[in-house]
Every structure is written in C-alpha cells, then in structure tokens.
C-alpha cells in the first residue's frame, strides 16, 4: 500500500476506514511538524516518546504478555504517561515524555527499560531491540492485522488496552481483539518521562578490518550510507531491495 500524507483528522479517518479489512494500515510512531507534498520532513520530527514493541516472533503471545505486565509494573509505579495496544501479534507500549532533540536520549532511556526487564525475566524476552528510528511505523488502532488469525482463520484487530486489562490472561485479550474496541482515547498516568542525556560518543582505539567484497554494484551514496549500519531501518532495506 502506498503511503499518503494526511493533514486533517477527517481525511485520516476516511483513509483508514477505506483501507481497513482490505490491507494492513500503518502510521508513523512519531509526529512531524512539517510535510512536503508527498512525505514528512525528517528534520521536523517531534521526539517526545519511546515506542516499545513486544513481538511474539514465534507466536508465543504468553511470553509477550508476561513481559508487558512486568514493564507495566514499573510504568504504573512511576505513573508515566502511556498508551498500550495489542497489535494482533504482540503489544505496543508508548511512554510519553518531555520533548528532546536527541534520539540517543530516547535510546538511553530504552536501555534502562530493557535492563529492568532482563533483571525481572532474564535475557529471553520479547522486547524488540530496535528503538529510536524516526521512520518506524506502527499499526493503526482498531484496524485488522492481516497476519494474525484465530482457530477459525479470522484475523485479530489492533486494539487499545487499559490498566484493568492487565488482570486478564492472554485468552481474554484475544477475545477482546476479535472485534474493534471503540473506547475513549486517553493516556494513562500523569508524569512525563524525562529522557536522560546520552553519554558522549567516545572514540575507540584500534583498527576495524573491512571484509573483502566480490564485485561491486552501482549504488547511490546516500543508500550505501543508510544500509551500512549495524541495524538498517525498514525503509533503507526496502530501498536496497528495490534498487
């Protein structure tokens, strides 16, 4: 599905309603202040949240639900502002904070959350390591997840969850997700996350050996720089394949 820039709430609702139940519908994790005719302007990103993706890669939703509830104990104890969603195959947790202009600050806070979860449940957990990408997408609430299905082959919906839902087991969540869940949208908690200042990047001594390559494909310099990182974004990978 092609991306579309919408600037008004009504246009957004019309687009989502037209595509829902036909295809997967996504929107950006982060908001942007400015847009060109066909795309967002990356430099105008509003960095005011961290997106935590608990992904059931092996269809182990019980594991993902366990991890969400562990992290939510910390969130509720600190009264962080949050929203929580079941995506159809995992869970999306947003923690909202004071705006920062350095994505590394968000990544530093994420590492604190990750260390907390590892301390509680161990290294075998469902929290996705990819965080802090301004191009990251997330599923639109109350749209169908075409990659999911119940025992009868019916897909689940991405639905909002509230604090009271944390007492349910995963079967209770799946029952809720069998249809859209139209409840008033509101954030839980009252305290904004204060993203810690990331430590300065220090030079590392020594040399890095570059592996020999066989042949050379013509590639735009900007695309080469985008994919030659430790964890390329989804968009850069897609551009590489299409190139």
Language-model features, listed with the residues they occupy:
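Extended hydrophobic/Leu-rich segments
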Residues: 7, 12-16, 35, 170-173, ...
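Signature for HUH/AEP ssDNA processing cores
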Residues: 1-89, 95-118, 212-216, 232-235
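Residue-level preference for alpha-helix termini and adjacent loops
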Residues: 46, 50, 136-143, 222
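Generic recognition of flexible, low-complexity loop/linker segments
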Residues: 39-40, 81, 126-127, 226-231, ...
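Modules that initiate DNA replication and primer synthesis
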Residues: 61, 73, 90-103, 142-149, ...
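Short, conserved alpha-helical segments within structured domains
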Residues: 87-91, 132-136, 237
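Flexible helix-coil linker/hinge segments at domain or subdomain boundaries
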Residues: 80, 98-157, 163-185
């Amino acid at each position: 599905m092609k991306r579309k820039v919408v600037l008004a709430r009504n246009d957004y609702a019309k687009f989502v309603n037209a595509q829902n139940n036909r295809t997967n519908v996504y929107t950006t994790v982060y908001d942007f202040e400015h847009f060109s005719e066909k795309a967002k302007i990356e430099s105008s990103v509003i960095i005011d949240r961290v997106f935590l993706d608990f992904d059931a890669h092996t269809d182990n939703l019980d594991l993902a639900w366990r991890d969400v509830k562990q992290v939510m104990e910390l969130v509720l104890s600190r009264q962080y502002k949050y929203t929580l969603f079941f995506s159809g195959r995992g869970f999306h947790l947003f923690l909202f904070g004071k705006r920062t202009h350095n994505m590394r600050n968000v990544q530093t806070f994420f590492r604190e959350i990750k260390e907390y979860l590892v301390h509680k449940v161990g290294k075998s957990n469902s929290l996705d390591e990819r965080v802090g990408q301004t191009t990251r997408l997330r599923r639109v609430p109350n749209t169908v997840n075409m990659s999911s299905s119940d025992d009868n082959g019916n897909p689940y919906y991405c639905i909002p969850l509230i604090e009271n839902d944390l007492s349910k087991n995963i079967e209770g969540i799946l029952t809720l997700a069998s249809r859209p869940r139209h409840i008033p949208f509101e954030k839980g908690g009252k305290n904004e996350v204060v993203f810690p200042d990331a430590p300065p990047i220090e030079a590392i001594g020594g040399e890095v050996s570059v592996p020999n390559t066989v042949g050379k494909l013509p590639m735009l310099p900007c695309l080469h720089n985008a994919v030659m990182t430790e964890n390329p974004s989804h968009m850069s990978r897609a551009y590489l394949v299409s190139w």
